[in-house]
């Protein structure tokens, strides 16, 4: 399975930490030292997870050699949907008039991208598809509560899209060596560590310490697992693209793995926690740099709990 191309979309509205002083009493210094976040992007009133997904696909088509007509599978991922019936994947299918293909949306919180890719892998293995469009989008600010001093300041919005094929389509395609996912609902605070109950309240981080501990442990564990399983060592890894939940989590994982800051892709300072989109944006923004290496890994942890990793190699 190969990653052919990737692109992302960020809303134009930028929210600095100063905004939250009036909302939840937290200063810029307090937020930055504890999260690593300085600014984040916020969707405009006429934007949502679906519209941002469409914009990400538009950007993808601008830079890709693949026509949308080649797609025979669309997988969408989000935990902040605009519509739970007319889902992200269906809206993308409609907007770009992609006929007679399967369109599926998935949610495993911040792990949704890796699960979406694993679903693609399954369709390819069953010979039910050859070319997939994977789209992830998060409208976190539509669900977050700015006055929440525990989590209101964490979230940012954005979307990303990628073409994935069963066979290599170009010399610069990146090959998926393996994808691993894991449900962790029975670990720690599992299903209640982070919550979003639309009929009741917005995004809540009820057990932040529990999330922190398990995110550090499982992102480290699954990264080691995917490398070892495929005969690689940490020293072989050129770049790590971790979920952008908190700079302390990112630094902890990198330290446990023994990976330098130079090899760790970070965008949380500018974008906040963009949920399941964060690693896709990290790859999209740093694609030229990543392609100069040989081996890189996406590693994630999500509410629920869940974790996942994808190991890829370039064509060097």
What is the predicted function of each stretch?
Residues 1-45, 148-213, 217, 221, ...:
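Condensing-enzyme catalytic core mediating Claisen C-C bond formation in acyl metabolism
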Residues 3, 31, 60, 71-74, ...:
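Buried hydrophobic positions in well-ordered alpha/beta secondary-structure cores of metabolic enzymes
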Residues 3, 45-108, 229-250, 256:
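Conserved beta-ketoacyl condensing-enzyme motif
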Residues 24-33, 83-97, 130-140, 193-196, ...:
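Acidic-glycine-rich active-site phosphate/pyrophosphate-binding loop
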């Amino acid at each position: 399975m190969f990653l052919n191309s990737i692109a992302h979309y960020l809303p134009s509205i930028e929210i600095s930490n100063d905004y939250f002083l009036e909302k939840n009493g937290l200063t810029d210094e307090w937020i930055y030292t504890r999260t690593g976040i300085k600014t984040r992007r916020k969707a405009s009133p006429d934007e949502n997870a679906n519209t941002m997904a469409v914009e990400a696909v538009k950007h993808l088509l601008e830079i890709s050699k693949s026509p949308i007509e080649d797609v025979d599978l669309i997988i969408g991922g989000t935990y902040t949907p605009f519509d739970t019936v007319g889902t992200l994947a269906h809206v993308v299918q409609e907007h770009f008039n992609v006929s007679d293909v399967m369109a599926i949306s998935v949610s495993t919180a911040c792990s949704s991208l890796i699960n979406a890719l694993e679903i693609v892998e399954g369709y390819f293995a069953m010979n039910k598809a050859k070319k997939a469009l994977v789209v992830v989008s998060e409208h976190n600010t539509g669900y977050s509560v700015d006055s929440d001093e525990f989590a209101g300041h964490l979230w940012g919005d954005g979307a990303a899209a990628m073409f994935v094929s069963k066979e290599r389509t170009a010399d610069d395609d990146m090959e998926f060596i393996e994808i691993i996912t894991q449900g962790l609902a029975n670990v720690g605070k599992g299903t209640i560590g982070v919550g979003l109950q639309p009929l009741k309240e917005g995004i809540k981080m009820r057990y932040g310490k529990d999330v922190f501990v398990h995110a550090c442990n499982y992102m480290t564990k699954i990264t080691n697992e995917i490398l070892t399983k495929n005969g690689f060592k940490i020293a072989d890894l050129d770049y790590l693209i971790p979920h952008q939940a908190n700079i302390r989590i990112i630094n902890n994982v990198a330290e446990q793995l023994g990976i330098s800051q130079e090899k760790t892709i970070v965008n949380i300072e500018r974008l906040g926690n963009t949920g399941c989109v964060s690693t896709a944006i990290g790859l999209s923004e740093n694609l030229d740099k990543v392609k100069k290496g040989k081996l890189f890994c996406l590693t994630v942890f999500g509410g629920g709990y869940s974790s996942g990793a994808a190991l890829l190699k370039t064509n060097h």
